[in-house]
From Swiss-Prot:
One of its GO terms (biological process) is 1-aminocyclopropane-1-carboxylate metabolic process. Homotrimer. This is 1-aminocyclopropane-1-carboxylate deaminase. It catalyses: 1-aminocyclopropane-1-carboxylate + H2O = 2-oxobutanoate + NH4(+). Its cofactor is pyridoxal 5'-phosphate. One of its GO terms (molecular function) is pyridoxal phosphate binding. The active site is at S79 (nucleophile). It is an enzyme of class 3 (hydrolase). Signal peptide: none annotated. The keyword Electron transport does not apply. The gene is acdS. PANTHER family: 1-AMINOCYCLOPROPANE-1-CARBOXYLATE DEAMINASE-RELATED (PTHR43780:SF2).
Amino acid sequence: MLRLDKFKKYPLTFGATPIEHLPRLTAALGGKVQIYAKRDDCNSGLAMGGNKLRKLEYIVPDAIESNADTLVSIGGVQSNHTRMVAATAAKIGMKCVVVQESWVPHEDAVYDRVGNILMTRLMGADSRIVPDGFDIGIRKSWEDAIQSVKDAGGKPYGIPAGASVHKFGGLGYVGFAEEVRAQEAEMGIKFDYIIVCVVTGSTQAGMIVGFAADGRADRVIGIDASGTPEQTRTQVRQIVDNTAELVELGRKVRDDEIVILEDYAYPAYGVPSAETNEAIRLAARTEAMITDPVYEGKSMQGMIDLVKKGYFPEGSKVLYAHLGGAPAINGYSYTYRNG
């Protein structure tokens, strides 16, 4: 049994998220593989929720115990993560500084004024747009923001991009795996594959550790959306090892149990391809399930392509992890102006 119980958890979500069968999407893809979705996009009342809240539930107790008064984080201009950090800060009564780097080579008249960044500002966060480009690692702009809070007499608590390389960043998605196992028992089924978008890495890494407990680590199929897959793979490996030790998995996860597919991130991080847009429209028009062009649209594209290519054996049950992110689609208003 994985030892998640050792760690304090601050409630930011409604609890277990629903799993739903997607019959019209299943039929549209030929009906030979059954598609389900785990709706982590519907996990909270905090500013439209999303996957980062699972991670932050295990990080907030540490932030509170540190006597911090300001959460400091980083992401792109349309970062879901910085929205969730801003929401968490508002909920627990802390100040918030978020650095918004220029990660996406995307031009839209309203890109920096709608969606995630709009809500981030609305919740009172100090949102600082900087020109630095995309990188999932530890960033100088973030370190500078932490120092600026100190210089102003504040007590910062740093949360890296995606909450991923934080010491507790992988715990929330170990919990996801435990939750899925309980739901499988209730539903009387077992999922053969789990599809998840991967960029900064801790969502997939936590799932890998969680599903390693029942031998399904290599059934967690990461769809890279970073466009820098080797950096992502290295970061996932590090988070897997750290998280496995924290929860006492009792063995090292093998390299061949970390599955990341690199075929769908093109043309660049945050820039949807024609195939991404087709996937977004198909999910919307068959199941009214909204996915975004940065993350979930690309993992949806990957899943659709894998089904069509016969990657999954006939009769497989595939669980699509919907991590949230729909607010970002507002920053692509011209792309989707006609649907």
